[in-house]
A protein has these predicted regions:
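Extended non-catalytic accessory segments flanking core domains
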Residues: 33-338, 419-423, 429-452, 496, ...
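Secretory targeting and sorting signals
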Residues: 1-32
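Short, functionally important structural connectors and interaction interfaces within domains
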Residues: 4, 16-18, 32, 253, ...
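Divalent cation-coordinating acidic motifs and surrounding scaffolds
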Residues: 278-609
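Generic, ordered loop/turn and secondary-structure boundary motif
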Residues: 27, 38-41, 345, 559-561
Length: 609
């Protein structure tokens, strides 16, 4: 991804900004003036009272949120009905910091029932039932808060979500909740209620927005480092739950994957655009370390070529992470011979003044690598056209090759630039690039507002290796796993499919020139190893994703919403797959840690050309 943080509006916005949101208004018959919370919630995702005024809705205050854009309080009816599909809690949206109300107050609330869609209706998100424009009366104070309902491996179903209603474009909104059958229905049946998890293992590290992810099913698609692997579109991992806090940000734990929130973590169950169902904790369990350590890969032998890909997340000269990135490259990656860097920004970072050169950015990293005890890398890259390659505005992110000249040489040929396509020619009977470095098919519409592939020709021990550095378009705009549309739409795939076809076509051109050419296509593919994007890259056996040489439980380079998943890949031509004695390592140094310097883990491939 170009930047995870760039998709966030501000810290602790929770259910999000009203101007970016929408409400769903339904037409329904008149109801009696006095209703209970479970009547408002109903047995589907949409309230039968949406758009109506309700009067004197009774409940006990279970939580008060006085920060962010979604301020208000939760109430819960202490006298539940017998229907497991109807929640007994609801959020009362005040818009400003609630005054005159505290946890334990018995209140009556009058206002308008609303279905608020975090992120707006175009996001495809589910809605959150709220009472808006409230007038409330405190009847008494100091009451016992309704006991928190346990969310556990026993209560959360194995199946993730029902199939959406075809007549409603795949929406689940109108379907009667089946909380004993589907995980999303189970969570919806608890929306707004006081819930708890016990001894929950962390599967998504604490982030700058004081959020983390836990699982109530620690065995579910588990990996050896404590995470939960997303290994197919049907492996959504139902035990995942986001945790936020009603306390001070300074009191939020700095948790890594594999840690445990020992004891009870409890609070109201919310829904927001940055993770769906979220336990907004008034009580957080004690942090117990799982002892997670950063990995280091082995050094390549003298006869092995080590090639790596590393997304350094919007690196520009003003960043304070150069020494840490250098240390990772030297000590955790064992100084690979060739490194494809993604998200190298221009010399003035996000300042949008027409600068496109990145020599200062790359030079600072090379100097830091030397200071860390590594080799003095040489480098190659092509400056993009200003503002044409996506990413953070003004940053002009691009891919860059680092290479160790004591181990490999770079073949410079032609005068490649941002708009000139490199091609395939034959030199001394072998496949070669017409421009090295050069860009692959840069005029192809597949690369609109996205990074164009960078191709380079290297020589190791007399053998030519062609390397293509990629950074495919991001997943921005895809519907979330917890969306109202099931299965969710992945609209961003369309562009990546075109990009994959373009790279695959180029590799086929190489192989038609030299059948046994050594080709490596690597980078931030922004898609899974089981995705159609990857299958298109691999079409007709031109390439093979080497991450699939790892056990399924070890295939991940990124952690998103508690799912450990593959985004970064190294793909190889048949000569390397079958004859290169390849060794692959996803080196976990970032994605699982709260103090990460990038949101991606680097990948290393060793082989014998």
């Amino acid at each position: 991804l170009a930047s995870k943080s760039s998709t966030r509006l501000a810290a602790l916005t929770v259910a999000a900004v009203c101007s970016a949101a929408s409400t769903i208004v339904l037409t329904s018959p008149a109801h009696a003036d006095s209703v209970r919370v479970h009547d408002i919630q109903g047995s589907t995702r949409l309230s039968p009272y949406a758009g109506e005024q309700v009067t004197d809705v009774a409940g006990i205050v279970t939580g008060v949120r006085g920060y962010g854009s979604s301020r208000g309080f939760w109430i819960q009816d202490p006298q539940p009905d017998a229907d497991p599909a109807t929640s007994e809690g609801v959020f009362v949206f005040t818009g400003s910091t609630p005054k005159g109300v505290a946890v334990g107050d018995a209140v009556t609330v009058s206002g308008t029932v609303s279905e608020y869609v975090p992120g707006g209706t175009s996001s495809g998100n589910q809605s959150l039932t709220e009472i808006t424009r409230p007038v409330f009366t405190v009847v008494s104070s100091g009451n016992e808060v309704p006991a928190a309902t346990a969310v556990s491996a026993r209560t959360v179903p194995r199946a993730y979500a029902p199939e959406g209603d075809e007549a409603a474009n795949g929406s689940v909104n109108g379907l009667t909740l089946r909380p004993a059958k589907y995980a999303l229905d189970h969570y919806e049946s608890l929306e707004g209620m006081n819930v708890r998890v016990a001894d929950a293992r962390v599967v998504g590290a604490s982030d700058p927005y004081t959020e983390l992810w836990v699982t109530v099913k620690p065995w579910e698609n588990a990996n050896r480092r404590g995470g939960t692997v997303y290994g197919s579109y049907d492996s959504q991992n139902t035990g995942r739950l986001q945790i936020q806090s009603l306390g001070k940000p300074a009191d939020f734990p700095d948790a890594n994957v594999g840690d445990t929130l020992a004891g009870t973590t409890a609070g109201p169950l919310d829904y927001n655009q940055y993770g769906g169902y979220t336990l907004v904790a008034s009580e957080i369990g004690a942090l117990e370390s799982g002892g997670l350590e950063r990995e280091s890969t082995r050094r390549q032998s003298s006869r092995e070529l080590a090639v790596a890909t590393y997304n350094v997340e919007n690196l520009d000269p003003s960043d304070e992470t150069f020494a840490a990135h250098a240390d990772a490259i030297v000590h955790n990656l064992a100084s690979p011979d060739i490194v494809s860097l993604e998200e190298i920004q221009d010399n003035d970072g996000a300042t949008n003044d027409g600068t496109v050169a990145a020599d200062a950015t790359v030079g600072k990293l090379i100097d830091a690598i030397v200071a860390a005890g590594g080799p003095r890398y040489d480098w190659r890259g092509i400056d993009p056209v200003d503002g044409e390659d996506g990413g953070q505005p003004g940053g002009n992110i691009r891919q860059v090759f680092l290479f160790n000249p004591e181990r490999v040489s770079f073949t410079d040929r032609g005068t490649g630039d941002a708009t000139t396509a490199t091609g395939v020619t034959k030199v001394r009977g072998k496949a070669a690039l017409t421009h090295s470095p050069g860009r692959v098919d840069p005029a192809n519409p597949a690369w609109e507002d996205s990074r164009k592939p960078l191709a380079g020709e290297f020589v190791f021990r007399g053998r030519t290796v062609l390397v293509i550095a990629n950074h495919f378009s991001s997943k921005g705009g895809d519907q979330s796993l917890s969306a109202q549309y099931q299965p969710p739409a992945r609209g961003s795939e369309t562009q990546r499919h075109l990009q994959a076809k373009a790279v695959n076509t180029f590799v086929k051109d190489v192989l038609s020139t030299q059948k046994n050419a050594d080709v490596v296509a690597l980078g931030d593919i922004n898609d899974f190893e089981f995705s159609r994007t990857t299958r298109l890259l691999e079409d007709d056996g031109a390439l093979w994703s080497a991450v699939k040489s790892l056990p399924r439980s070890e295939r991940y380079s990124y952690v998103y919403q508690g799912n450990s998943q593959v985004l970064d890949q190294i793909l190889v031509s048949p000569s390397i797959r079958w004859g290169g004695r390849l060794s692959y390592d996803s080196v976990h140094v970032n994605a699982e840690f709260h103090d990460q310097i990038s949101d991606h883990d680097p990948q290393v491939l060793r082989f014998r050309p």
